[in-house]
Amino acid sequence: MTKIKRALISVSDKTGVVDFALGLHKLGVEILSTGGTAKALREAKMPVIEVSDYTGFPEMLDGRVKTLHPKIHGGLLALRDKPEHTQSLKEHNIGLIDMVVVNLYPFEKNTQKPGVSIEEAIENIDIGGPSMLRSAAKNYRSVAVVCNPERYAAVLEELRNNNGALSRETLQEFGVEVFRETSRYDHMIYGYLKKHILDKAQDKEGAFPHCLGLNLVKVQDLRYGENPHQKAAFYRDAGETQGLAAMKQLWGKELSFNNILDLNAAVNIVREFSLPAAVFIKHNNPCGAAQNQDILKAYKQAWSCDRISAFGGIVALNREVDLALARLIAKSGFLECIISPKFSLETLGLLKDKKNLRLLELPVGAAPRGRPEQCATLDIKRVWGGALVQDEDILTLDENNLKTVTKQKPSKKEMESLIFAWKIAKHTKSNAIILAKGTKTVGIGAGQMSRVDSVFISTKKAGKLTAGSVLASDAFFPKEDAIVLAAKYRISAIIQPGGSIADEQIIQTADKCGIAMVFTGIRHFRH
C-alpha cells in the first residue's frame, strides 16, 4: 500500500476536481497546484501551495513552463527504496510527491473549432501535463497518477477505506492507463500536424508510414459482435466530427454491430447521388436502390426491386422523411433501421408505433470524389498476425472516359441507366451484377464465386423486368458465357471495366447478340 501525503493537481477538465481535492485535504493530503486549478481550489477555501512557490521558480514564457522543474520531477521519479535517490532528494531539498492528478489540454476539442489557426493549435499542445503523467507512471509502484475525472470517486473511497493509502493493483492500473492516454494524445497531435503543416513533398512516408497507429475513441459498447458469442464496441476516429458516429438515434432499441455495418453500406450508396435516392441493405449488400426526383417514388422503386430480401433490412435516404413517406414505410413490413437527414415531428409520431424500428438522423453529404491518392481515409482489413491497408475506393467515374467498344451504341437513356447501375455495383460484394431500368435496380446478384452465377441470380430476381434492362459488372468478364446469358434474357446494354484477355471475344459476342457494351477502365472489387 502507498500512503498519499502530497498530491499535485493541475487539470484542464475541472469536472469534479474541487470535491476530489477537498476529499484529499480531509485525509490530510498536502495539495500543490498551478494556474486555473489553484484558483478554483482557493475559491473553494482550500489551502493550496502554488507550484511556483514550491519550486521557488516562477511560471514563465506565457505559462509554457510551469512544472518542468527538478523539484517536481525529482519528487515523482525518485525510487523510494533506493538510498542513493533518497540522499539526492535530501541534498537538493526535494520532497516526495505521492499523487499526480492531471488531464491534458483539450487539443481535439479546440482544433475542431471553425477557423482555428496552426498557431492556436500548437498552443493547445500540452507539454508539462504529459511530462508529469509519464514521470509518475514510470514510478507507478510508488506514485498514484490519476488522469481521468471518472476515477475520482473510486480513489477517494479506497483512500478512506485504507487509512489514506492505495493498493499496488490500483497504482499499476493507473500507470498503464497513463501511457494509453499519452500515446493517444501524441498520435492525435501527429495526425493533425501531418495533415496541416506537411505538404506532399515533405511527407516522405505518405499514407503508409513505417509504423501505423490507430487513434480511435469509443462511442459505445455494443450488446455483442457479429455473433452473440463475440464482444464488440463502436469507435470513431479521433478528431472526426462526421461519419456514422455523428448519427443521432431518435427511436428504437440499441444498435447492434451488424446494424452499424449495414448502415455504413447504405449511407455510402446514397452519398453517390445528388437527386433523391433510397437504398435497402441486407447483409452489407444492396437489395434495392433507386434515384428519382421524388423521394417517395425513389423509396417505392427501391423497395419493389426485392421485397423478400428487403424484409428485416436497413434503409438509407438522402432526403427528409415526410408524412407520406412515413406512411409507406409503416406498410413496408419489418425493417431494422431507417437513416435519413431529417424526420419531421409528425413522422416520428407515426413511426414510433413500430417498436422494433430504429430511426436515425444523419446529414448525408456527398461521397468523397477523386483519385485514391487524394483520399485521407485508409481502408484497413485485419489478417492473421497483421493488417492489409489501402486507400479508400473513392475513384469516381468520368463519363468523358467511357469507351463504347461495340457496334451497338447505348442510347442516352441507356447510358444514364448504366451509370446508375455502375454506382450500385461499386458498393456490392464481388462478384457483383446489377440490373437496372431507368434509375432503379430491378435485379441484383452479389457475392457469388462465379460471375455468370451472379448474372443468373440477377435475372431471376428481376423476372419479367430483365428484358430491356441494362447490366453493370464490378469487374471484367473472363468468358463470353455471361454475355450469352444476358442476351438470352434480352438485356440491352452492359457496363464493365474491361481488361480481360478475352475482351475481343467478349466484344464479338456482344456484337453478335446486339448488346451495347461500355468499358469504364475502372474495377471495383469488394471482398
What function would you assign to each model-found segment?
Residues 287-307, 440-484:
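Glycine- and Gly-Pro-enriched alpha-helical subdomains that act as flexible
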Residues 315-316, 322-331, 464-503:
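Cysteine/selenocysteine-centered motifs that mediate thiol-based redox chemistry or coordinate metal-sulfur cofactors
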Residues 1-54:
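N-terminal glycine-/serine-/threonine-rich phosphate-binding loop
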Residues 80-130, 134-136, 406-412:
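Active-site/ligand-binding-proximal alpha/beta "capping" segment
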Residues 333-360, 485-527:
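C-terminal binding/interaction regions
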Residues 36-107:
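Glycine-rich nucleotide/cofactor/substrate-binding loop typically near the N-terminus or early
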Residues 150-364, 376-392, 414-423, 430-432:
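Active-site loops and adjacent core secondary-structure elements that bind or stabilize anionic groups
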